[in-house]
Amino acid sequence: VLLEVKNVKKVYGRGMNTTMALNQMNLEIDENEFVAIMGESGSGKSTLLNLIATFDRTTEGLIKLDGLPLNQLKNKDIARFRREMMGFVFQDFNVLNTMSNKDNILMPLVLANERPKIMQKRLMEISEQLGIEDLLEKYPSEISGGQKQRIAIARALIARPKLLLADEPTGALDSKTSKNLMCLFRKINQKHQIILMVTHSNIDASYANRVIFIKDGRLYHEIYRGEESQTDYQKRIADSLAILNGVGD
């Protein structure tokens, strides 16, 4: 098991004015998995991602990544741990417009004081894999949204993280670009990259090999694709969402 979330609670606020964002959340993710997280707004999806990403700490419970309990990390070690173990892809790309695409991609390796020779080698490898060789000398303002997201993915993967975390990665993209991006995610996953993705799109979720549904801060339901066609799997995801959103109305 690469990622283990055990009996995790997350409470915001104090005294009488508290909100329980996660309540006894349990989840395990194995090597080579591509997992999508779905649920209504406020269900706890983003909270879970933030806790795994070490942007926040649990109130109770344990999260382990590659056997290491995240709550034992000291503040001074968190940035390095995050840089070495995780890659991040967000809806709004988070690329720096004042830097070339190449420098955006290389930033995690620069921060890690990696040797220039290795940086160049990794840059060439990831650029070829993502088909962005011709974008490296350009700036983010000169390229499309889909291309910016590829730059962000290259930056996320260049340090060879154990886990790629994606929060609504196609949220700012049109449907054709979204499909291309999800095909890319699947291809990356097939090269043994573990991906955990929060999404509201059943189309995007159908590219994952497992979908977990969160309701009221708990794991409510999960489905595996198995040998199913993507169309049938997508329908099953949509049906599960309808049930999830209909319960308690």
Walk through the language-model features, giving the residues of each.
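ABC family nucleotide-binding domain
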Residues: 2-3, 8-210, 214
